[in-house]
Regions:
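Alpha-helix-loop-beta-strand connector modules within alpha/beta enzyme cores
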Residues: 408-423
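Glycine-rich, histidine-containing beta strand-loop boundary motifs that form or position
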Residues: 15, 72, 79, 86-90, ...
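Catalytic and substrate-binding clefts that recognize carbohydrates or anionic sugar/phosphate headgroups
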Residues: 1-232, 242-243, 254-259, 631-653
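Short beta-alpha connecting loops at secondary-structure transitions
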Residues: 351-357, 399-408, 450-458, 535-540
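Catalytic core of carbohydrate-active enzymes
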Residues: 420-432, 438-452, 471, 475-485, ...
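Catalytic nucleotidyl-transfer cores of nucleotide-processing enzymes
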Residues: 303, 450-467, 554
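Aromatic-lined carbohydrate-binding/catalytic grooves of carbohydrate-active enzymes
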Residues: 230-384, 388-401, 444
Length: 659
């Protein structure tokens, strides 16, 4: 039970009879100030300069009922369900706020968004500002290093040098509490040795909650940020093939997989609305209408494939190609985000400019939603990639009149909401699945599935296959319990190209993930594809069958996420109170009973695996293991996967039938 206890000298937050957080008269743990933050955006990457003009520590003077009375203003505490809401009052005139929480050396911190390079954030400084995860400069330097033989797959920049598609002012402590802010402006978390310093660039309420276990803590958090609903039944029935290039190519590649007894539940054709070939690769024409020239008879093929149990998925984002008809309509109606001069604000993504639909304009919001209903859903698509959401410039002029600095972070959640409403208003929730890249608070209750963005097709720690595991785990810690990645990565250009080694290892990992979906990549012609030869066709087909065999198990885990907010991909420390479990970001639990340790090095045939204190059965050999660290054989097709001996599910039997 959560309680607030007050006397003349202190206010304490108590959980199950134990004091967890104590505020004393005279403490200076709050501060307010005035300042401004300047943002410069280049292709979704932000240079941020902070200017603090005033900062005033606020001493606690006294307590009145559940209120913390400060030198200026007060903080009102309200217990709402199992969480405590801290609501600042009387702090008008300030636009920055600081709050300090006590910490200790052994405490771990997790979350703050989708984090690709770290798992435990102790000692780090996290900036909460939605952006592109990988920028042009980083990729260019990497390609040059590869060219001159300086490839270093273990290289990582300082933590603060990385940005992320999904940011959220939320963290989970290993001491079984969470902090979550209602702020929409930038936040900064400093996880120091003896304290955690929280800065928000606005005066905003926040939440703290405690629980006996991490599952209950996630339920408390997702009571605030929301949860994803259960997935359509067809999603579990194998692999969604990533194909592009037209109707004939789509069917040819699909039939190859069928001939190898692959389990195909969908075909994702991102170029259904048209292809734009640029200097960086094969991209898309952002005009959300069927390209009949590239995909003749697609409407008929969709119906034929649906009869075979195969769905067809497309692509959509909140931009508009300025050369195409939908933009002409939008700009004529005043539906685009404006710049300070009143012109449509055109942003450059890679090599071309695009306009943005102003989602704060109710008419524009309904216009793009109706396009999704008519051109995607009514056309017959069973899902789509709902891309982007990170690019709203802070000097934009919005229809609502709101300051874009306070809307920038929430833009991807608003974009997810458009897509979610289109699905629900069409009566298709439970039949259609869209998946999003960018996110913020609000995304967990709007999206149907996350994906981990434009990863590099290699084993690099910061951008390649290894980065996927901490990314999925950190999303789970924010309440987004459904996520997956492009099989083989995406950003292929020049000497960044997908080879057979990384492709097979990515197939293995995604077979043991919530969703199995492929992607041809930015430059398909330089990448290995699933139909390159009979060997990879058979390998990919086998992995799809293994994934399909997980259907009952995954459905149960997804249902738990929908009901309780406990993600499908879970960190080991959820159930094992061991030091290594709190720091291991490169293994994960799929549901409660399966431990997965993807192979993360090129040409590796073994992998060192940490097993928490339990009884485990190695999937491929059925050999039993106790807790400990082992070097496990990992030939292609057999990444280290272990099933709990005392699993309540029959998942081991289901998998053994397939392997």
């Amino acid at each position: 039970m959560l309680e607030i206890k007050v006397n003349n000298k202190s206010l304490s937050i108590s959980f199950e009879g134990q004091d967890k957080l104590i505020f004393n008269v005279g403490d200076e743990i709050f501060a307010v100030g005035k300042g401004e933050t300047n943002y410069s955006m280049n292709r979704g990457t932000f240079a941020i300069k902070e200017h603090i003009f005033e900062k005033h520590p606020l001493k606690i003077e006294r307590f009145a009922k559940n209120d913390i009375i400060l030198e200026k203003g007060k903080i009102i505490l309200k217990i709402e369900d199992n969480n405590i809401h801290f609501i600042p009052e009387g702090l008008d005139g300030f636009n920055m706020m600081w709050f300090k929480l006590p910490s200790n050396k052994s405490e771990g911190f997790y979350g703050t968004g989708e984090i690709f390079t770290e798992f435990n954030l102790k000692g780090q400084k996290a900036t909460i500002w939605v952006a592109e995860h990988i920028n042009v400069k980083q990729t260019t330097i990497k390609m040059l290093n590869n060219l001159v033989g300086l490839k270093n797959l273990n290289f990582c920049r300082k933590f603060g040098a990385y940005e992320s598609y999904y940011e959220q002012p939320t963290f989970i402590s290993s001491n079984k509490y969470f902090y979550h802010s209602d702020a929409t402006a930038r936040s900064v978390f400093k996880f120091d040795k003896d304290q955690t310093i929280i800065q928000t660039d606005q005066i905003a309420p926040f939440w703290i909650s405690y629980a006996e276990d991490f599952e209950s803590l996630m339920t408390n958090l997702t009571d605030i940020v929301g949860r994803q609903p259960e997935l359509p039944d067809w999603v579990y029935d194998g692999q969604i093939l990533g194909i592009q290039g037209g109707t004939d190519i789509m069917m040819e590649k699909y039939n190859k997989v069928v001939a190898h007894n692959g389990k195909v539940n969908g075909i994702w054709i991102q170029d259904w609305e048209g292809r734009r070939v640029t200097a960086v690769g094969k991209q898309l024409f952002w005009n959300w209408e069927w390209d009949k020239e590239l995909y003749p008879n697609l409407d008929k093929k969709i119906k034929e494939l649906n009869k075979q149990g195969v769905k067809v998925l497309g692509y959509c984002n909140p931009f508009l190609a300025i050369e195409k008809p939908l933009y002409k309509e939008a700009t004529a109606k005043g539906y685009c985000v404006k710049d300070k001069d009143g012109n449509d604000y055109l942003v450059k993504i890679t090599t071309f400019p695009a306009a943005m639909v102003d989602l704060t304009n109710p008419d524009a919001y309904n216009w793009i939603k109706d396009i999704i209903k008519k051109n995607l859903i009514d056309f017959g698509l069973s899902g789509w990639m709902a891309d982007f959401g990170e690019y709203l410039p802070t000097d934009s002029v919005l229809f609502s009149g709101e300051n874009a600095e306070y809307i920038h972070n929430t833009w991807p959640a608003l974009w997810a909401k458009v897509n979610r409403e289109a699905v629900e208003e069409s009566g298709k929730l439970g039949e259609i699945m869209f998946f999003t890249r960018a996110g913020y608070s609000g995304t967990p209750k709007q999206t149907l599935m996350m994906w981990n963005g434009d990863n590099h097709p290699d084993f690099s720690k910061d951008f390649g296959l290894p980065s996927i595991v901490p990314a999925m785990l950190s999303l789970t810690m924010c309440g987004c319990g459904l996520s997956h990645s492009d099989i083989g990565g995406y950003t292929s250009i020049m000497n960044l190209r997908r080879n057979m080694d990384v492709y097979k290892r990515w197939f293995e990992m995604n077979a043991f993930s919530p969703l199995m979906r492929g992607h041809e990549g930015l430059n398909p012609d330089i990448n290995v594809q699933f139909d390159a030869n009979d060997d990879i066709l058979e390998f990919a087909s086998k992995m799809s069958r293994i994934h399909a065999a997980l259907k009952p198990y995954l459905k149960e885990a997804v249902a738990k996420n929908a009901k309780e907010g406990v993600g499908v991909v879970r960190p080991l420390f959820f159930y094992y109170d061991e030091k290594e479990a709190y720091n291991n970001g490169y293994e994960y639990l799929l549901g409660r009973d399966i431990l997965v340790a993807p192979v993360m090095r090129p040409k590796a045939t073994k992998r060192k695996v940490y097993l928490p204190d339990d009884e485990w059965i190695h999937l491929w050999s059925q050999q039993e293991y106790k807790g400990g660290t082992y070097v496990i054989d990992a030939p292609y097709g057999q990444i280290p996967v272990f099933v709990r001996k005392n699993a309540k599910s029959n998942v081991l039997e289901q998998l053994l039938k397939e392997i």
